[in-house]
Swiss-Prot record:
Pfam families according to UniProt: Rnf-Nqr (PF02508)
InterPro entries in the record: NqrDE/RnfAE, NqrDE/RnfAE_oxidrdctase, NqrE
One Gene Ontology term of the molecular function aspect: oxidoreductase activity, acting on NAD(P)H, quinone or similar compound as acceptor
Domain of life: Bacteria
GO cellular component: Gram-negative-bacterium-type cell wall; plasma membrane
GO biological process terms on file: respiratory electron transport chain; sodium ion transport
SUBUNIT field: Composed of six subunits; NqrA, NqrB, NqrC, NqrD, NqrE and NqrF.
Protein name (record): Na(+)-translocating NADH-quinone reductase subunit E
Predominant location category: membrane
Amino acid sequence: MEHLLSIFVKSVFIENMALSFFLGMCTFLAVSKKVSTAFGLGIAVIVVLGIAVPVNQLVYTHILKDGVLVDGVDLSFLNFITFIGVIAALVQILEMILDKFFPALYSALGIFLPLITVNCAIFGGVSFMVQREYDLVESVVYGIGAGTGWMLAIVALAGLTEKMKYSDVPAGLRGLGITFITVGLMALGFMSFSGIQL
């Protein structure tokens, strides 16, 4: 149990997808204007990572890994295309669910919901799972933790962006300029967690 808690805390704070690895920056910067929209996208990322990482772990372990299906046959060269296919299918299912049950959130996310399919934070989570050789339970914990860390970062950035609307930001820094500075300062803050040994 302590090992699983360690994986979760590391994936949320120490190895944050957005602020340590800078993965998923396209949607991270574009959807961080309002806290409500950022929160909705964060939940979507948690759901996709929480399902995609363990499903891809099963696919990798039982189909693609060297010698699993047939001795001497290594299908790991199909990792990328298989992982992307599984992620795309999960995002399509999530998109249909949001359209049916949460139409306001679906329209607020707009084009960025299908972009989760090619979001490098999602693919990075799956790739890190393979690289670190997590089992199924560890994959579930890691997927949910990585999604939670990404959501924490985007909601914090959205909150800061909403506060900056009322600030006197110099004309040359308005928009993406001040956002990049803010993300850099947030990343520096999250670097303080890197000294924690779990």
